[in-house]
Each structure stands twice: as C-alpha cells, then as structure tokens.
Amino acid sequence: MMGIFLASVGFMFFSVLYVQQGLSSQAKFTELPRNVTATEGQNVEMSCAFQSGSASVYLEIQWWFLRGPEDLEQGTEAAGSQVELLPDRDPDNDGTKISTVKVQGNDISHKLQISKVRKKDEGLYECRVTDANYGELQEHKAQAYLKVNANSHARRMQAFEASPMWLQDTKPRKNASSVVPSSVHNSANQRMHSTSSPQAVAKIPKQSPQSGARIATSHGLSVLLLVCGFVKGALL
C-alpha cells in the first residue's frame, strides 16, 4: 500500500516537472524586430515582443546597438534575417545598451524609437529578453539591421555649414571724389590756373587801386577846367 502511494506521488511529481518543462519550451518571441531602411531625418521604430511559457518572476527587455556598418562584412548588412540567438558571448562587451524595460508577468514588449535618424545610427541592433524563472535565468535574443540612406539636402546643408562664409558690407560707400578734402581741390584749381597759357592771362586786364585813383583825379581836373572856361567866357 505504501509502495503504491509513493509511486503515485513520484508520478505526480514527474508529471508536474514535465509540464513545466513543456511550458518553458514554449517561450518565444511574439514579435521580432525587422530590418529597417530609412532616410536621414526620419523617425525609426523597431518592435520586440516576447511571451514566456511559464509563470515568471519577471521579464526584461534590453535594446542594444552592437556595431556599425564598418564592422560588418560586405553583402551581409541587409541580408541578416531575424534569428533568435543563443547567449554565446559576454553581453557587457557586445555593444552599447540603449534602453531597458522590466515587467512582472508572462508577456513583455518594447519599441525602440530613434528620432531624426542619422548616418551614424546605421548598424546592427539587438533585442535581448531575460526570462527570470524560478531557479534559473533564460536569455533570448533577436537582431535587426538599420540602414540609413543619405539625404542629399542634408548633405548640401552640412557642406554649406562647413564651407567658409565671406561677409559682404552692404553699406553704400561714398564717391571717391567726394571724400577728397577741399584743400586738395583748391590746390588742384590753383595748379590749373598757374599752368594756363600766357595769352589767356594777357586778355584779362589787371587794375590796381593806384591806377583807379589817377583816372578819377584826371577826370575831375578836366571838369574843373571846363567850368573855368565857361565862367571866363561869360565874364568877357
């Protein structure tokens, strides 16, 4: 009787363990991140969702940036498919952690959002899920590649900003002749008068104050003599 009881207990124990293992094996990604091609300046989203097959203590999603295009071989940049990877390397030395979300329950999802994507954002991204079950930690990974095409307008603006700028004074400038001092004009006029021909100078009679006085005196004497002549004639 005791043996039957022990056998029943053992059967139930192994049955529960088998069910737990079966449920754990059903843990999966319900939404895998997809490869994205964007143009510089656009907003980009990558989605990742996971469902645990058993009651978990907590679920955690981390988004990582692994490496840029210069670290990837030619021809494999956009050809990589969304494949769940096994943890085979040290995660702390694998790239740059971007964000973390942690929940209690069997389902978790998290979107990676990049605003105004730039060329340096291009590369391989990874969604890492940690399933904290009773007694053990399970890690699941999925990757996607972000390709960023150059924006011709943005490139032109960057080239314009990088080029030296020549500033032009828009203030109107005065005529060069108006800036010359008046003394310069006076000296120039004097030089012009001094270099004129002798014939032109000879045509302009010069009168001094003394000559004017002599002319006035002779004119007065002639008038006086004329008056005296009239008086003398009248007396005779």
Swiss-Prot record:
InterPro entries: Ig-like_dom (IPR007110), Ig-like_dom_sf (IPR036179), Ig-like_fold (IPR013783), Ig_sub (IPR003599), Ig_V-set (IPR013106), IgSF_V-set/TM_domain (IPR051102). N-glycosylated. N-linked glycosylation on Asn-35 and Asn-175 is critical for secretion but not for preadipocyte cell differentiation activity. GO terms for biological process: cell differentiation; cellular response to BMP stimulus; positive regulation of brown fat cell differentiation; positive regulation of gene expression; positive regulation of white fat cell proliferation. This is V-set and transmembrane domain-containing protein 2A. The gene is Vstm2a. Homodimer. Plays a role in the regulation of the early stage of white and brown preadipocyte cell differentiation. Promotes adipogenic commitment of preadipocytes by increasing gene expression of the transcription factor PPARG in a BMP4-dependent signaling pathway. Glycans are attached at N35, N175. Residues 1-24 form the signal peptide.
